[in-house]
Swiss-Prot record:
HAMAP family: UPF0161_YidD
GO CC annotation, single: plasma membrane
Keywords: Cell membrane, Membrane
Pfam families: YidD (PF01809)
Subcellular location, principal: membrane
UniProt-recorded name of the protein: Putative membrane protein insertion efficiency factor
Homology family: Belongs to the UPF0161 family.
Record has Metal-binding as a keyword: no
Membrane topology summary: Peripheral membrane protein
Length: 70
C-alpha cells in the first residue's frame, strides 16, 4: 500500500512539478526515475532510503554521471 502511494507521489512530481523547473539533476537516470526504480525493486522502505541517499548526493559539488539502481 505504501509502495503504491509513494509511486503515485513521484509520478505526480514528474508530471506536474518537474516540468516547471529547469533540468538540474546531475545523474542519469534522474533522481525521480531512480526513486521509482528503487521503490519498485526493493519496496517502500529500502527504496525510499536509497532515493533519499541519492537526492542528498545530487548537488553542484558532485560530478554525477551514470548511477542506476543496483
Amino acid at each position: 500500500m505504501l509502495k503504491i502511494i509513494l509511486i503515485h507521489i513521484i509520478k505526480f512530481y514528474r508530471k506536474y512539478i518537474s516540468p516547471l523547473k529547469k533540468p538540474c539533476c546531475r545523474f542519469y537516470p534522474t533522481c525521480s526515475k531512480y526513486a521509482l526504480d528503487a521503490i519498485n525493486k526493493y519496496g517502500a522502505f529500502k527504496g525510499s532510503i536509497m532515493a533519499i541517499k541519492r537526492i542528498l548526493r545530487c548537488h553542484p559539488f558532485n560530478p554525477g554521471g551514470y548511477d542506476p539502481v543496483k
